[in-house]
Design a protein with these regions (language model features):
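A conserved segment at the C-terminal end of the G1
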Residues: 51-55, 63-83
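ATP-dependent carboxylate-amine ligase catalytic core
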Residues: 26-33, 38-48, 74-148
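Short active-site-adjacent helix-start/loop capping segments
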Residues: 61-65, 88-91
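Positively charged, low-complexity intrinsically disordered leader regions
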Residues: 1-51
Length: 148
């Protein structure tokens, strides 16, 4: 196994150790966003580096997000797309100009986000989804996406 693949697998293993609101043994108020707010602050507020199209609803969000992303890309904008869940590869969740984020970029960004998240003790709860969202926002900022 090559070193980049090993690092990728190590990052995936660490990500899986972060709990989810749904499976946590401790009840939490999921409306409180202190954990993700602190993490984004410590990352330099990557969510402020690009314009966001937020898609909500029951069905068709992934397809709608992909279509909007492609249309913006055709117009010459650097576009990112963050969707959930993934089917096979976690990198399906984060696309840059219509392509899955590379393992190298994913590992670099995830390593930084996880390092900061690990440094918190006795602070608000962070979930698997919070961590992945922060990774996506950081990737989009680092890769100079204009629309996400």
């Amino acid at each position: 196994m090559s070193q980049p693949d090993k690092s990728y697998l190590q990052v995936l293993s660490e990500l899986e150790q972060w709990g989810s609101y749904e499976t946590s043994a401790q009840p939490r108020d999921i409306s409180k966003l202190e954990g993700i707010r602190l993490l984004l602050k410590d990352l330099g507020h990557p969510e402020r580096a690009f314009k966001i199209v937020h898609i909500a609803g029951t069905n068709g969000k992934g397809l709608t997000a992909t279509m909007i992303s492609r249309l913006l890309c055709i117009q010459g904008f650097a576009t990112g797309c963050y969707t959930s869940p993934h089917l096979i590869d976690i990198r399906e969740r984060i696309a840059l100009n219509g392509q899955y984020v590379s393992k190298h970029i994913f590992v670099q960004s995830a390593s930084l986000v996880l390092k900061i998240a690990r440094s918190y003790t006795g602070t608000p709860y962070l979930s698997y989804f919070d961590i992945l969202t922060a990774i996506a926002f950081y990737v989009f900022m680092a890769e100079n996406m204009e629309w996400v």
